[in-house]
Amino acid sequence: MRMKQLYAPTLKETPSDVETVSHEYLLRGGFIRKVAAGIYTYLPLGRRVLLKIENIVREEMNRIGAQEILMPILQPAELWKRSGRWDDYGPEMMKLKDRHERDFTLGPTHEEIVTDLVKNELRSYRQLPLVVYQVANKYRDEIRPRFGLLRAREFIMKDAYSFHSSWESLDETYELFKEAYSRIMERLGVKYMVIEAETGAIGGNASHEFVVPAKIGETNVLYCEKCGYQASDEKAEYRGEYPVEEEEEKPLEKVPTPGVRTIEEVSQFLGVPPSKIVKSLLFVGRDGYVMALIRGDLELNEAKLKSHLKDQSLRLATPEEVLKDFGVPIGFIGPIGTNVKKVADHSIKGLKNFVVGGMEKDTHYVNANHPRDFKVDEWCDLRTVVEGDPCPVCGEPLRATKGIELGHIFKLGTKYSEAMEAYFMDENGEMKPFIMGCYGWGVSRTMAAVVEHFHDENGMIWPLSIAPYTVIVDILNMNDPDQKRVGEEIYRALLEKGEEVVLDDREVSPGFKFKDADLIGFPIRINVGRSLKDGVIELKKRYSKELVKVSIQNGLGSLFEALNRMKAEYDPREAIE
């Protein structure tokens, strides 16, 4: 490919809506162009990277015996209603109606479609296990698309699904996917973590995420340097001890707290620490209102609450709903005299004489106690674990970091097969629901994550495995006939050897060419410039300042040898260490 022909419109200036390095460089480097918020066109360079990522993923899927299919993006609501997720999935699901007023969705995932497919085809345990996958577009109506490809409304994903006759079979396939995903990460060359994760709207009883550490990552990771425990903050368990207060219970008292709503305001106004206040948070779910209770100095983990109640539709009640149904502003809600289900974190078990909302505007109760003043229906761990909390395995203080999720795998069990009546006949002639797993990989976000991982102040630093082109040949002076002739010879010779090479034959300054080459991130640059008069050309790794001079007076053999050595040594991790 010649730069004169390559459709890669680079930008000197950074677009105003850019928030991340990957978003900036992919736009400026001519890899993507924005169509609307969270929707992008992939230009030739971006498409080449995507195809290479897809090929790596396909190779690893095929290696473990998964078979590729392609399912429709447009999915009928009937299947989602059958699984119970039409309402549970939330506002991120893109819904639409056809001309006959029938409901459809642009698929964010394909559990319903694939389960319906298999239930009509597989009848016997002898046909199991089955593993299928696809690489296709997915859709999420993000409330605020941001970070370029990292939180988009349309994105490319590999999703795989497995069907089994036993849990042991699912466990074996689950481990195969863990190994396959680890190999994908190794081939990308990035640092990564495999963490325990919450199952969320997908469901199931076990889940792991594969994340790339990054400052702008949206996955909060807790990890233990001693025992190796790793989990998302949604999943991380708190197993520390809570103090049991020995003080005597005091009489309950309602006190005026005019205009005091937040934990901080209540703490200052009443002169009590936040740990002596109980937060009361009202949620609306499938079965109505639920009140979650937790100590005032801790943060409630909504994912844990949803998991405990097995209700992914759960959401915080709005101030308008609370005022309408309880007759009190939201800042004064409390558990006393409230006839709703109450789920409490273990942190309040040992509390005595604490503060709660007064269920009346501008009032709070002091010296509240349970079970004297209110009943807790269910106890569970609702606390968001933070850095410094004890590791649930060994007790050492946990460390925290952020990461970009690329892969997510789930043991679904029989959630979908039972809901959709997908059964097979086992070896005893009994009808049993399929035991399922599902396994996602974000293809388009992988491109952004790699850029976040490998870049410098000049642009992207692609690993060889997914670089759009491996080599760029820069003719530094297009008016020099010798440079032009030799540059063309090198370009044609590399093409004949099967190298993915670009020839920069534009009539622009060397500095302009170098800046574009660095911005785009070609792994290896070959300079054909003034040193050619001495029979010498230069090779340079994208992340290195060192120029390797190679004599070509006796032909191009020495160039090919130097290039092969440089490719063998090429490791963009050197740029970030």
From Swiss-Prot:
GO terms for biological process: prolyl-tRNA aminoacylation. One of its GO terms (molecular function) is proline-tRNA ligase activity. One of its GO terms (cellular component) is cytosol. It is found in: Cytoplasm. Keywords: Aminoacyl-tRNA synthetase, ATP-binding, Cytoplasm, Ligase, Nucleotide-binding, Protein biosynthesis. Gene3D superfamilies: Anticodon-binding domain, Bira Bifunctional Protein, Domain 2, YbaK/aminoacyl-tRNA synthetase-associated domain. It catalyses: tRNA(Pro) + L-proline + ATP = L-prolyl-tRNA(Pro) + AMP + diphosphate. InterPro entries: aa-tRNA-synt_IIb (IPR002314), aa-tRNA-synth_II (IPR006195), aa-tRNA-synth_II/BPL/LPL (IPR045864), Anticodon-bd (IPR004154), Anticodon-bd_dom_sf (IPR036621), Pro-tRNA-ligase_IIa (IPR002316), Pro-tRNA-synth_IIa_bac-type (IPR004500), Pro-tRNA-Synthase_IIa_type1 (IPR023717). CDD domains: ProRS-INS, ProRS_anticodon_short, ProRS_core_prok. Its EC number is 6.1.1.15. Its main location: cytoplasm. Homodimer. Consists of three domains: the N-terminal catalytic domain, the editing domain and the C-terminal anticodon-binding domain. Catalyzes the attachment of proline to tRNA(Pro) in a two-step reaction: proline is first activated by ATP to form Pro-AMP and then transferred to the acceptor end of tRNA(Pro). As ProRS can inadvertently accommodate and process non-cognate amino acids such as alanine and cysteine, to avoid such errors it has two additional distinct editing activities against alanine. One activity is designated as 'pretransfer' editing and involves the tRNA(Pro)-independent hydrolysis of activated Ala-AMP. Belongs to the class-II aminoacyl-tRNA synthetase family. ProS type 1 subfamily. This is Proline--tRNA ligase. The lineage of its organism: Bacteria, Thermotogati, Thermotogota, Thermotogae, Thermotogales.
